[in-house]
Amino acid sequence: MTDTRRRVKVYTLNEDRQWDDRGTGHVSSGYVERLKGMSLLVRAESDGSLLLESKINPNTAYQKQQDTLIVWSEAENYDLALSFQEKAGCDEIWEKICQVQGKDPSVDITQDLVDESEEERFDDMSSPGLELPSCELSRLEEIAELVASSLPSPLRREKLALALENEGYIKKLLELFHVCEDLENIEGLHHLYEIIKGIFLLNRTALFEVMFSEECIMDVIGCLEYDPALSQPRKHREFLTKTAKFKEVIPISDPELKQKIHQTYRVQYIQDMVLPTPSVFEENMLSTLHSFIFFNKVEIVGMLQEDEKFLTDLFAQLTDEATDEEKRQELVNFLKEFCAFSQTLQPQNRDAFFKTLSNMGILPALEVILGMDDTQVRSAATDIFSYLVEYNPSMVREFVMQEAQQNDDVSKKLTEQKITSKDILLINLIIEHMICDTDPELGGAVQLMGLLRTLVDPENMLATANKTEKTEFLGFFYKHCMHVLTAPLLANTTEDKPSKDDFQTAQLLALVLELLTFCVEHHTYHIKNYIINKDILRRVLVLMASKHAFLALCALRFKRKIIGLKDEFYNRYIMKSFLFEPVVKAFLNNGSRYNLMNSAIIEMFEFIRVEDIKSLTAHVIENYWKALEDVDYVQTFKGLKLRFEQQRERQDNPKLDSMRSILRNHRYRRDARTLEDEEEMWFNTDEDDMEDGEAVVSPSDKTKNDDDIMDPISKFMERKKLKESEEKEVLLKTNLSGRQSPSFKLSLSSGTKTNLTSQSSTTNLPGSPGSPGSPGSPGSPGSVPKNTSQTAAITTKGGLVGLVDYPDDDEDDDEDEDKEDTLPLSKKAKFDS
């Protein structure tokens, strides 16, 4: 049999009961050996690949809808649809399906939609079709009961639907509706409401086509006004005829398109406003209604796209200066609805839609509209712009860069136009609208900031062999736009505190800082050059003095993001300008309050300590230690001081660092098990042995026991043990009885170096009140044994701690030592033997 090729779109129904477009191709029917039967084949028109191969199963229920649709279920919860470009192609494939199943092609459905039970199947064989009562006023109650009783059974629903179709019953019911309204027969109107609602739940396309026809749809809506659960009927028809006016902003010449728009609006209104909220059971019975609306929308968008005269007139009138304001507002609102309409389409359809709008010049038109004074028009234009950015940010970037290039070319010829040409850049208009938002809650500014963030996000920028969109666009953005974005920040931070500190200004600056923080994270050298050259961080930190905590935290978050990069260019800039001073001032001014500001500042310094950022550690201790040394409810600042002293010690004794490297390299060359064994033996050595300078190594490495290497290592380990004792003593200083409220004074003088290795300092440190076994307790006079000190440290960590407290992990190498000291005796004995 020869194939009949017809152009179709293939759809599948997803979990949300929405149709997904699987592609466009040509359908044919033929025998497929692998499937052992006649099948439907769809090959993609782009590359000829197979989009669909479906055997025409004799028991599958196929439905023909709206003359150009064939819908069926391949398996449970897997629905398919073919949408034909031409009715003739649909008819030919439908005839082929009916031929395989032995059905009359005049039917719209080939099988029952749901498998009925054996009992129902027997009843079907033994009983004739459903007989409807005569359509009379006196029998409305009987009809309503019949419809209600048929809904639970798939077989009875099918019989009822066939009876309603064959007898033209719906139109007769609508005639009775007029009679009931004229007679004010409320009981009859209530019965009609139940009947029409039940017909919707039959989920039958053929019935919908009758109900949604021009002559019937308003009467159907009228029946649904008389809900028995309501004391007064709804006035849906009055709203649709008097309030909801169809404005033809651009004349539509195609009467079929106009009728389709009217029908879709009304059916959507029925679904959203008229029908009661369906139950889960009823929701599944309204899938055909969803499909009806979906395919109508696809058709409308397609017909409008193909009408080039319509779109040309639309954009011409939008940008024409002679167009009056009311007309322009209507045009913009239409375009906004048109774009919103497209969001229901599948990706392929949306691509074609926005490509058409782009070719028609939507972005230049939006630029003109955004420059107008009418706030409503600008708001609608912003919504349209958001659709474009979400759909294809690269398209928007390409436009604004081309625009900037054109302006630069003009400015070379006419220097006086340089400022004007920069001011009219589309992206600068967006930034200005964000900055000038008059809404107290800045709803529009938040939306625009999100769009700008999408545009400057490198994650969605394209990269090709010849050029990189990221490099080109970011170069453009920092040259032409960044000064506009930072203008309100720079204007408000000329002094030591914000010149304007009202709530709306604070909200706006918080938005600007949020975008700048995003840039710090994603833009590397572009934002780095801008921050350092324009001294942006110093201006941002002025906002730490704001009375609005959320703005001060935004400023702190900006600096924290910069420090988190661990970039020495940034670090040198921070140190050169003494940019920790505003942070320390804010910390001291916050006093003894436990709040987010306190925690965030401590976390910043803790990050510097844990990551061992040497330059910042030295800068903080040398310049701010006097102001921070009394903070003892966390160990962060004392830990920073310890880091600083260790750095000094390494600088004073370079051999110490080299010995540590030798030791580490010597150990890392061996496998992990050997390393672990040797660590146990090393750290289980008696202190007396260490004092004598003897090292314990595994027999396998005795040949490597060079006196020139191991003698300095032994000295290093002695010094290391003294430091560990010192650190444990520092831990014991944590106050377990609650947080202190020391008085602070900011001092920028350098702190004096403390000798951390002196024996006297380790034995005279005060202990924590209430800590068992601490140096000051009666049970531990004089020096502290190793196990006692360790117990005290563990108790301190397990007790009550401050809001922000961190484990003291200055030396990564000490972790293994702590573990080894707690080994059971049996394990130690294994290595001592």
UniProtKB/Swiss-Prot annotation:
Single annotated GO MF: protein phosphatase activator activity
Composition bias, Acidic residues: 683-694, 806-820
Bias type Polar residues, positions: 734-751, 785-794
Residues bearing the modification Phosphoserine: S117, S127, S698, S741, S768, S771, S774, S777, S780
UniProt keyword terms in alphabetical order: Acetylation, Cytoplasm, Cytoskeleton, Nucleus, Phosphoprotein
GO biological process: DNA damage response; gluconeogenesis; positive regulation of gluconeogenesis; regulation of double-strand break repair
Region (Disordered): 683-712, 733-833
InterPro entries hit by this protein: ARM-type_fold, EVH1_PP4R3, P4R3-like_central_dom, PH-like_dom_sf, PP4R3-like
Domain annotation WH1: ranges: 1-100
Principal location: cytoplasm
Keyword Acetylation found: yes
Domain of life: Eukaryota
Sequence positions bearing N6-acetyllysine: K655
Pfam families noted in UniProt: EVH1_PP4R3 (PF22972), PP4R3 (PF04802)
Localization (cell): Cytoplasm; Cytoplasm, Cytoskeleton, Microtubule organizing center, Centrosome; Nucleus
Keyword Acetylation: yes
Family to which this protein belongs: Belongs to the SMEK family.
Task of the protein: Regulatory subunit of serine/threonine-protein phosphatase 4. May regulate the activity of PPP4C at centrosomal microtubule organizing centers. The PPP4C-PPP4R2-PPP4R3A PP4 complex specifically dephosphorylates H2AX phosphorylated on 'Ser-140' (gamma-H2AX) generated during DNA replication and required for DNA DSB repair.
Subunit and partners: Serine/threonine-protein phosphatase 4 (PP4) occurs in different assemblies of the catalytic and one or more regulatory subunits. Component of the PP4 complex PPP4C-PPP4R2-PPP4R3A. Interacts with PPP4C; the interaction requires PPP4R2.
Protein name (record): Serine/threonine-protein phosphatase 4 regulatory subunit 3A
Organism: Homo sapiens
